[in-house]
Amino acid sequence: MKKHFTLPRNAILRDGGEPHSPNPSISKSKPPRKLRSAKENAPPLDRNTSTPDHRSMRMKNPLPPRPPPSNPLKRKLSAETATESGFSDSGVKVIVRMKPLNKGEEGDMIVEKMSKDSLTVSGQTFTFDSIANPESTQEQMFQLVGAPLVENCLSGFNSSVFAYGQTGSGKTYTMWGPANGLLEEHLCGDQRGLTPRVFERLFARIKEEQVKHAERQLNYQCRCSLLEIYNEQITDLLDPSQKNLMIREDVKSGVYVENLTEEYVKNLTDVSQLLIKGLGNRRTGATSVNTESSRSHCVFTCVVESRCKNVADGLSSFKTSRINLVDLAGSERQKSTGAAGERLKEAGNINRSLSQLGNLINILAEISQTGKPRHIPYRDSRLTFLLQESLGGNAKLAMVCAVSPSQSCRSETFSTLRFAQRAKAIQNKAVVNEVMQDDVNFLRGVIHQLRDELQRMKNDGNNPTNPNVAYSTAWNARRSLNLLRSFGLGHPRSLPHEDNDGDIEMEIDEAAVERLCVQVGLQSSLASEGINHDMNRVKSIHSSDGQSIEKRLPEDSDVAMEDACCHTENHEPETVDNMRTETETGIRENQIKTHSQTLDHESSFQPLSVKDALCSSLNKSEDVSSCPDLVPQDVTSANVLIADGVDDPEHLVNSASPSLCIDPVGATPVLKSPTLSVSPTIRNSRKSLKTSELSTASQKDSEGENLVTEAADPSPATSKKMNNCSSALSTQKSKVFPVRTERLASSLHKGIKLLESYCQSTAQRRSTYRFSFKAPDSEPSTSISKADAGVQTIPGADAISEENTKEFLCCKCKCREQFDAQQMGDMPNLQLVPVDNSEVAEKSKNQVPKAVEKVLAGSIRREMALEEFCTKQASEITQLNRLVQQYKHERECNAIIGQTREDKIIRLESLMDGVLSKEDFLDEEFASLLHEHKLLKDMYQNHPEVLKTKIELERTQEEVENFKNFYGDMGEREVLLEEIQDLKLQLQCYIDPSLKSALKTCTLLKLSYQAPPVNAIPESQDESLEKTLEQERLCWTEAETKWISLSEELRTELEASKALINKQKHELEIEKRCGEELKEAMQMAMEGHARMLEQYADLEEKHMQLLARHRRIQDGIDDVKKAAARAGVRGAESRFINALAAEISALKVEKEKERQYLRDENKSLQTQLRDTAEAIQAAGELLVRLKEAEEGLTVAQKRAMDAEYEAAEAYRQIDKLKKKHENEINTLNQLVPQSHIHNECSTKCDQAVEPSVNASSEQQWRDEFEPLYKKETEFSNLAEPSWFSGYDRCNI
């Protein structure tokens, strides 16, 4: 989530230096806001009207303060800026959409669409870009507005869509769709708004572009934000807690909303979630016109960034485009909406904001039509201030004006259409926001140019006859270096800063200082004979275009005044913090060889190249005066370029001697083991400031070795000569560079004074720094007090040093050196042992042979370890040679594979040209693939990376085992610790002050193991002891010399092996890089061949189609020609007939193609028709079955109703019969007693006729009850076979 919202401003439209227009009408068109009318076309106020107080205006104005007239943010438009900008004009696209009428408004329509781009309102015609009638769909609106917007966005243009109109006219529906249209189940519906459709198309097009330009590494990134402007206050809809946000404006980034939330989106679902979240927080309210009226302006912004890079030429581009979707609140009248209270306040703010927008559009339209400059009031409202880039700026604007065709909205419709007409007249300046980067090709050109200059410098450096060439070469080098620095390529990486603020005393090796001064004098004498001539020539040398070098000095002064840099033979120059140096050698090679040979004969140092011996060299335009008192006249060398800008002693030391090591020395000596008497060699070291361990104070150089030396202090005469040399240097340098002369001179004098103070202050002759020509990576040694220590040296070293002292130093220094040599001459190489005057002396006598034995044993062990290491290095070299051979084999295989690819291309070309048949092509291709498979198999089996990994693994295992054996099993660590302890005790004896007087008179012990102890030697044999000790001294010296020579040879062989290994590693890296490049080239070639095959297949198919078409055309032409020949047409008419025949044949072919297309269409339509007929038939059958089922259901329902009715009737009859039966039973019950009484009477009276009477009475009763029995029988018969009971059983 990103809290930043940027709207870039078009700098072309800004004109800060242009004054206000003198036209009074223009100045009056912008009165103070407090007296402004709320109407759009309010007349300008009188010029004499008094302006209100600025304080009250500032209190009521919520916007940021206006910039002063001199501020470049003040924007004015004029015809000159429009013509001078050079950008293509793009007008505003206006689309009018008519809202469908409501039920109460039908039949009362005043807006009528005349054509696709015009409409009439009450007889008045308006013309726009497009007209959407009430029947238009959301998809049609998207095709008119959204589709071009997406394409413009992908092309790199800023695009905006405004929805403008009265309240309830359908703006929100057009922009966002219905209220539930953003849910997932409605995302694919027809009612979707413009915004979801735009982003659906945008993400689809992004995927297409990424697939289409996959080789260009095309990547897109989209981020969105949503805000509303409610009552002139900006609220973040994605984070509603952030209210009243401020609009900021910056010259670089343009207009943006501070602290606005931006979220990255990747698909349509993310955008929909943002819209649902944001639009749910938007202010809406109900009015009498619209139940869901938007009460604020809503701005949805999406920034689309694309990056692509062409791998072939290194060209990369960065495009940025912005989509602004603005849903403006609708204008409304209080009379029609009935707004009151808060709604009335909202309506007032909305109308005021829209009025200011209309005023802004009026001014922009007037500027576009008349070309007169006017002030554009972007700051009148938050809306216009935020969207000023879309209005007359760098954007393509489309405005959707929604109108209602009802008679009741006539005035609002006219106002909207007039607003749209004015907006259509605006001309924006839309440009593609793309940044192209072509650094690779440019740098290739720079490299080519620098190579040419380097070649010219090498060629011209060997030409001593033309001295002017060196000057031009130096200036070309400076110009090239300027070019590199302008692109950041000439700035070397600095070493990490070291904290040197500690209280550490540094010891200066003052002999090295003097030798440095001597060498500076030697080298500066090179140009002593031709200094005046060269200084005069600097002023007269002219470049090829006629300009003198003096005139070009100010241009290149920043390069010329760079600090000096020390170059080595095998390494790049390195720089320390705040020290960037450059070196330009203008010395001929024959002179360099002569000077190096001279230095070899006259100094004790190992022969060094000029790059190692000097800090840097002067250009021939920068001459240095020599010190004739210090330097012989027959010695010549290179000029030295003194680094400027050095203000402190440490920098002075660094600039004076780049190859000197600065060794920190502790306040008290640290007792550590001395180094073996092994002579280190000079190595090509980089110029750097390194702190290392202390070196022995009196260690001296020996036979081509470069060790730390220490000599006597320089004399005042020498310091005076150094002062003269530095003053001469600063004086002559000021002639060429007058800018920094004083600073350079002061720094030199300060450094020389500091050296003099160090030389004269301390009694022990120690200084803060030690100067040494020792390589920075050499082994450290222990620092011991010069007056209290004895050091083993090689015979002859004193003589060499003394010779050097006699050759170059002053008289005082020479005497001092001779005295020191005489003091140490009697015992130059042997170890000093105290006499037997104390218990300490006796202890040291007993420990001397044992200590010497341990030292020799340790040195032998180390020599054996060194031999073993050399053997391992030789085996590694052998393995590396094998690895090189495998790399060469791999490169040869790659070359063969490349050749096979070229042969394949030739075969493909032959196949396309028809020279090679398809079968031959397949056979050759198969053979080539078999050969390539074999090569790849060999490469896989003998891959160098596998062997390299095995070699490294074996080497690591051997090293681990050796370290384990050396320090663990052999006990070398304990032995070394014992040697260190013994040597410390021995050294303590020498440092003891009580033994200093005995050191001068003591005799040396015999260092042979067969010699008798010191206590057993009588005093009478002094002469024989001296002879014996002399012999032992000689033997010891020879043995030590052999060990030193052997160690030197081994070290030389080791360094040679290391150099060979480094060289082979470098070659391996080159071979590996070449292999990778060949692999990449092979991959690219294979991809290119695949694309060529695809294109070839497409071309072959098209070729076959064209051949068939050509044959048909040719046949038609032949037919027409035959017909013309049969008709007897000849001459000019035949040519006309031929042309006509060709045209007719082409038309026939086209008609045949169309006929075939129509035939296919007809077949498809017939198929669809048959399917439709079958579907209709099936639907008819289904309908018939449904109708039959419906009729059966109706009959069954009717029968069920009849059965229910009959059952009800039967139940009623049963009830009646039950009642009747009960009545009859009651009647019979009453008749039975009467019958009994009557029977008794009758028995008494008529006993004779009893049987007949009984028979008649029974028959009478039966007759009376017979109808009842019949009815019961009928009822039972009716109930048993009833269909209703069977129907029930069927239903069950």
UniProtKB/Swiss-Prot annotation:
Region listing for Neck, in residue ranges: 424-461
Subcellular location: Cytoplasm, Cytoskeleton, Phragmoplast
Keyword DNA-binding included in the entry's annotation: no
Chain segments carrying region Microtubules-binding: 293-297, 326-332, 375-379
Gene Ontology CC entries for this record: chloroplast; microtubule; phragmoplast
Domain Kinesin motor: residue ranges: 91-426
UniProt GO molecular function: ATP binding; microtubule binding; microtubule motor activity
Binding site for ATP: 165-172
Gene deletion effect: No visible phenotype. Kin12a and kin12b double mutant display defective pollen grains leading to the production of fewer seeds.
Coiled-coil features, chain-numbered ranges: 945-992, 1047-1232
Disulfide partners: none
Protein's recorded name: Kinesin-like protein KIN-12A
